[in-house]
């Protein structure tokens, strides 16, 4: 491998809620390995324990239950380690440098191309081709595209996510306001936030962190008809007039103090502020349901609804993404790792993932059960699937995302206007994209 993963991952990571011999293979193809597995069918796997890494503690209990089913069926044990998102990729970098990546782990579109292009992930192409369980047509095509590189597949889709608006019913009742509906526009949200804000700063109408692109302003940009990244990943759309118009809605919230300061939000996540009664509304991804359904405050006060529409276009878009189950290229347990990945992507496991309320599943037709898993209007998330666009990504996603967050933060602090920030974001993104295509 010409470049170490360390060098490729030296830039900072998005911290909220986004080595050498690891690429060396055994010289055995997946097809040959599958044949060897068939020969060894029936052998005792009880001595194998697969290391599994994820970043969400809320999903851990449900995944442990599903993996316990896997162990009963195969004899292969698993051990889940949770590393929070803020530290996950740093930990993976260190593991990659030491040649000790977990056997199986979550992969994200922000990092997938770098891992795939540097040979860090086990090639699953032939495993998938020969599987009776994993059929590509049963999952969204765009999710497969996140984890494919040069005609090869390196992960099996784990889930799919959409975005919805959460609101505090008690705060709306106290303000004498009707609850948000699917007919709302972003202007309706702004007007409600003005009425929900308290002058003493004890309560804000809305909350959106500077780095909350996926669950926040990406959706607004697409609603208005702007774009973040063009189809061939060569140009940023932040300087498009429609993108700027959409981002100026956020600027209004900032200028009118309808949302907490950047400093306050740097110390507290949006869900913490919402669940502590400090903000009346937030936008959140479907991956957060596990946290809400075990939170007494949310259970007593919260519900969700579809995102607002754009008043000009009438469009209501949800950015969507999906994680992938991947394996280390140098795992000592390739066959067992594949068996776990295959099981976790199966209709059976995907349906149980939805039924347990872990998250929406990638396997088509299984997420309806997820909507019944908690006493909230989770149908809103399924309805958001009517108009979805995949989360923008390129080989250097993390570098331009983090750089853009720094500029958006300067709008929060009054150092830049939103138009200035958008034009600067476009310029620096275009530089990063040009570097990608020059390699």
Protein language model features and the residues they cover:
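Short, well-ordered beta-strand elements
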Residues: 46-57, 76-81, 103-104, 154, ...
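Short, solvent-exposed loop/beta-turn-alpha elements that line the ligand-binding surface or hinge
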Residues: 42, 125-139, 182, 206, ...
């Amino acid at each position: 491998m010409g470049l170490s993963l360390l060098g490729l991952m030296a830039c900072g990571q998005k911290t909220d809620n986004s080595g050498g011999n690891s690429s060396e293979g055994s010289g055995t193809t997946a097809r040959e390995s599958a044949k060897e597995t068939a020969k060894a069918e029936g052998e005792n796997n009880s001595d194998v324990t697969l290391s599994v890494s994820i970043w969400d503690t809320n999903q851990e209990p449900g995944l442990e239950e599903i993996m316990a089913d896997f162990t009963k069926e195969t004899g292969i044990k698993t051990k889940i380690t949770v590393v929070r998102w803020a530290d996950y990729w740093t930990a993976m970098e260190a593991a990659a440098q030491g040649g000790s990546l977990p056997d199986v782990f979550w992969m994200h579109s922000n990092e997938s191309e770098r891992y795939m292009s540097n040979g860090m992930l086990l090639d699953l192409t032939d495993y998938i081709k020969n599987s009776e369980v994993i059929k590509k047509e049963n999952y969204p095509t765009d999710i497969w595209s996140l984890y494919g590189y040069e005609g090869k597949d390196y992960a099996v889709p784990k889930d799919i996510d959409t975005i919805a608006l959460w609101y505090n019913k008690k705060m709306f009742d106290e303000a004498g306001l009707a609850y948000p509906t699917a007919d709302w526009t972003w202007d309706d949200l702004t007007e409600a936030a003005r009425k929900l804000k308290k002058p003493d700063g004890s309560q804000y109408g809305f909350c959106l962190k500077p780095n909350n692109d996926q669950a926040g302003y990406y959706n607004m940009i697409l609603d208005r008809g702007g774009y973040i990244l063009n189809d061939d990943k060569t140009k940023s759309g932040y300087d498009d007039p429609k993108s700027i118009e959409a981002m100026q809605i956020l600027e209004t919230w900032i200028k009118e103090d309808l949302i907490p300061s950047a400093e306050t939000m740097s110390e507290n996540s949006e869900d913490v502020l919402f669940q502590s009664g400090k903000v009346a509304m937030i936008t959140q991804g479907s991956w957060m349901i596990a946290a809400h359904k075990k939170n007494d405050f949310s259970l007593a006060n919260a519900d969700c609804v579809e995102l607002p529409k754009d008043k000009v276009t009438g469009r209501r878009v949800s950015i969507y993404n999906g994680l992938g189950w991947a394996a280390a290229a140098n795992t000592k347990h390739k066959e067992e790792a594949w068996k776990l990945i295959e099981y976790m992507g199966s209709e059976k496991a995907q349906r149980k993932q939805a039924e347990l309320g872990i998250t929406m599943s990638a396997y088509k037709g299984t997420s309806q059960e997820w909507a019944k898993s908690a006493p909230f209007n989770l149908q809103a998330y399924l309805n958001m699937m009517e108009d979805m666009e995949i989360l923008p990504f390129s080989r250097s996603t993390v570098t331009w995302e983090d750089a853009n967050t720094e500029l958006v933060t300067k709008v929060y602090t009054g150092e830049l206007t939103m138009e200035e920030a958008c034009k600067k974001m476009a310029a620096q993104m275009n530089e990063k994209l040009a570097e990608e295509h020059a390699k």
